[in-house]
């Protein structure tokens, strides 16, 4: 320790007493080493006790308990002591060096004394804290929150949705959450359940504010409702302007962790103008709302809102049973089956299930139930409770549309059958002719506006998008289909008939099993008539429909249409006769339909166009697709207003005179046509308007693709029964083994669908690298195809990543196919890969990161054995594999039925639609 210091002092001197006290009195210096060791040991024990207490607190808080204030004070003191202890121990080596005489003395009396005293006192405090850390209780129930439980009825089928919505709202990164869904679907009930959970968990939030907004609510009313919850609404406050009120609301809420719940909003609520602090991860506040419009969700800042859907069939039946009651259901064995049928009419809509269930609760006679089914089938608006309890509630969604054209578009959709898919492209073309989309003469712009209008209806939950998995294979052009909920459809028909006062305005008996035209009391009152999807064979009656503008007769068994029936239809704008497979002749009285703009004769046996057709000066849309017996369209050049024409799959595609007729149609903007070998040379203007092209019977080797480059609007191409070894663009005639691409040739930017069928000499399709927006690729029965994209031919095109827009890849009966692409591809939008009878294809161009955002990705493959890029890829995609059987040629009729097809009727409908589409595209003979 070094030499000890010496000093001389008289005994009894005051200085000596102080030194003695420093060295011996409290033993701060003499016991310093011992105290330091004890402090380290006791501090370690205290930390262990601290961890035990913290774990107890965490467990209790996970049970929504609140930690005791004494526990928090103790934990804060431990943290403070821990810091102080670390500081003291960090300088202990220096302090120990100051000691001498085996620790009995020190070179620096004052500093060693002070340090020793701090160590001693800290040691005592650590011991005290350690003894105080033995808590019997670390928490207590939280104080009652300012959340008044809202009365709710028991719910059925919403438990999973409630859990998902609650968990999402409680996520740290979620400040704003929207729930959207159609009227009557149960949004408010679900919202109340969420509200009441805040009452269950207690003081996590300082205040939960519930506000019913409703349609047309003003800012001042919202401020007043919120102020009442915050106890601000005195006379002085009421006299302030909106800006000052917002300041007061913001001042109160800024210091609180709040939840604002806005039920039933119809437009964006300006939170800032009201005075609501914007929710963030810092303030941990929440704003939740319900709305019928997905568009409002986006405007409010929730770009991933949660949709509240109708109940599944079994949940709907359970709810309906509860409303009807066991006594009624057990009163007669037959009633249970009838009750199920009534419940099915509600299509899972809780509002309808509740109202109709309550109405039927006292009905114990079988005949009463049979009558209810008849009314709900024939005219649901007449059912008790429908006009005053269901339809007016749904009508709010219609009223909120604002734009009269969009309202008319919505009502027009009611002409289609219940549960029927509405093909968007044909619907929009009809809406254009009806005048609902405006006066734009450019078809593409008008169609885009039509899609925007349907988007508005979809976001308002008045229509539902369907067919994202199968749509591109089931339709000719449509990107998607839409359907209208049955109860919403009844609301539309109710509105269209002036709330039931003029039922003959809209005569809609689609899919009604009719064998003849229904009786109509006043033909002169009929504005629109839909008799599609029935079994009507003849229409021979006379009808004076002088006001009729729309007539749907498609998908019947029509053989004869009397001229007397259409004689007085001078105002008829839309006439759809498609899919009448035995219909072979239009009456000459067609010439009297002077207002006709839309005529669909596709999938009929019509053999020639009537001479009077040329009198239809306003005809804008003419569909003659798949008229296999139509020999001539002579005189069509007289239809000077024609803008859209389809001759796809028609027999006239082999007649060169057709092109001469078409070249005279100066206003033609959209043409679908099938070309045979002798018609490869096209007028430049005509080529530019082709949107759908079928090619059949080409024998060139190789096939020069250059003539297609001028078809700048080509969206769909199918090639059938053609024999060429490759498809190429003209650049060099000397080397036919490579794909020669001329950079000056525009790529096929609009091509979204490609079908290759029975092209037995083709070896690859490398040229599709120049179709960057391809959505569907279908290749079938082409024996020589060995690869989709050839690596050697694409050597100079490595900068192009193929299939970035592809959703559906179907490969069938390709015995030599070994490769799709030589390395993994991202496939950001891919939904399905369907492979059948491609025995040499053992590897798909996938890795673990392919198809990243697709929830319903599916692979149908027979046989299912594959080589994978790596183990991660296998784990990613193997669960999505569906083995297919070899019993069917059709890729949709195999065992790998999509998960979305839950009912036999839906599956049958899709199969029939698909087969129809395959015939339409000429995929099957």
From Swiss-Prot:
Family per record: Belongs to the disease resistance NB-LRR family.
Domain commentary: The LRR repeats probably act as specificity determinant of pathogen recognition.
Gene Ontology biological-process entries: defense response to other organism
Keywords: ATP-binding, Coiled coil, Leucine-rich repeat, Nucleotide-binding, Plant defense, Repeat
InterPro entries per the UniProt record, alphabetical: Apaf_helical, LRR_dom_sf, LRR_R13L4/SHOC2-like, NB-ARC, P-loop_NTPase, Plant_NBS-LRR, WH-like_DNA-bd_sf
Annotated positions binding ATP: 181-188
Domain NB-ARC: 139-442
Region (Disordered): 134-154
This protein's record includes keyword Nucleotide-binding: yes
Residue windows of the LRR repeats: 525-546, 547-568, 571-594, 595-617, 618-640, 641-663
Cited function: Probable disease resistance protein.
Coiled coil start-end: 25-69
Protein's name according to its UniProt entry: Probable disease resistance protein At1g61310
Source organism (scientific name): Arabidopsis thaliana
MF term (GO), any: ATP binding
One Pfam family in the UniProt entry: LRR_14
